[in-house]
Amino acid sequence: MSVILMVLLLAGCRMSISLTGGTVDARAKTVAINTFPNNASLVNPQLSQVFTTALKDKIQGQTPLTIVATNGDYEIEGEITDYTVNPVAIQGNDSPAMNRLTITVRVRFTNKFDENQNFAQSFSRYADYYSSQNLSSVETVLVAEITEALTDDIFNKAFVNW
C-alpha cells in the first residue's frame, strides 16, 4: 500500500531543475531564441548577431535546454531599441572627461508551462570610456561588456526570477 501511495505522490509532483541559482521546469526541454533586430537610431551592424549569440550561449551554457528555431517550451524574443553615446563627467572647461555607451533591449519571455512567468521588459546597461578615445577603437570591448551584463539580467529575470 505504501509503495502505491509513494508512486501516486511522485507521479503528481512537478519537479524543477536548479542551476546556478535558477530553475527550469522539468517538463521544459527546449527554448526558442529569435534574432534580436537592431531598431535603434544609431546602428552597430554587428550588434544584433553579437547580442543574440551571447544570449543563446548564456542559456545553453547554464541550462539543460536545447535551442530550437520555433515553438520552444520557453520563447525569448525582442529587439534592440537603443544604442546611444552621451557625455558624462563634465570637466571644468565644459568638455566631457568620459562618454557613456548605453544599450537597451526590449525582451518578451514566454513560458508555455506557467504563464505567470511570462514578461515583457526593457533592459538597459552602459559602459563608460574616456572621451579622448574614439568610440570605434573601444566599441568591441564595450559592446562585449554591456552584452554580458544584459544577458545576465535577462537570464536572471527568466530563470532565477530576480
Q: Can you describe what each PLM-predicted range is?
A:
Residues L19, G61-L65, D73-N118, Y126-E139, ...:
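Surface-exposed short loop/turn segments
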Residues M1-C13:
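Sec-dependent bacterial lipoprotein signal peptides
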Residues L10-T53, D57, P64-L65, F113, ...:
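A structural "domain/chain start" motif
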Residues E139-W162:
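Compositionally biased, intrinsically disordered linkers/stalks adjacent to structured regions
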Residues A69:
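Short loop/edge segments at beta-strand edges and connector loops
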Residues P37-N44, Q133-V141:
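Second-shell loop/turn segments in exported
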